Amino acid sequence: MQFSTVSFAIFAILPAMVAAMPAETSPVPKPALPVFEELCPDAERQKCAESTDNLKRCLQINGASICVIDCGSQTTCRTQCKQQLKNEKANGFCTVGDNPCICNLNGAANSAH
């Protein structure tokens, strides 16, 4: 079998064409949700609004007291936290501001009425 000049030219430039093609980019991973375990003092928690379950919750985030609510089925926050922390007991709390979903493993245990 003989190669024509055109066939030879195609085989000669094919590797260069493949190398010039842009590589497939992998999807950009979502940034990790923040995880905070330190609870607010009771006096700070008492200032927080109640969640739909009538409990007040507060977490210390970088030295600041942040009120959080148990967002439950209203968002995918809890599911995302369970996946991220690889723990079925993980919880996700909703807030307003820079961190709309905050992960927590202790369930914001100082929650109370």
From Swiss-Prot:
<keyword id="KW-0732">Signal</keyword>
<comment type="function">
    <text>Secreted effector involved in biotrophic colonization of plant cells.</text>
</comment>
<feature type="signal peptide">
    <location>
        <begin position="1"/>
        <end position="20"/>
    </location>
</feature>
<keyword id="KW-0964">Secreted</keyword>
<dbReference type="GO" id="GO:0005576">
    <property type="term" value="C:extracellular region"/>
</dbReference>
<protein>
    <recommendedName>
        <fullName>Biotrophy-associated secreted protein 3</fullName>
    </recommendedName>
</protein>
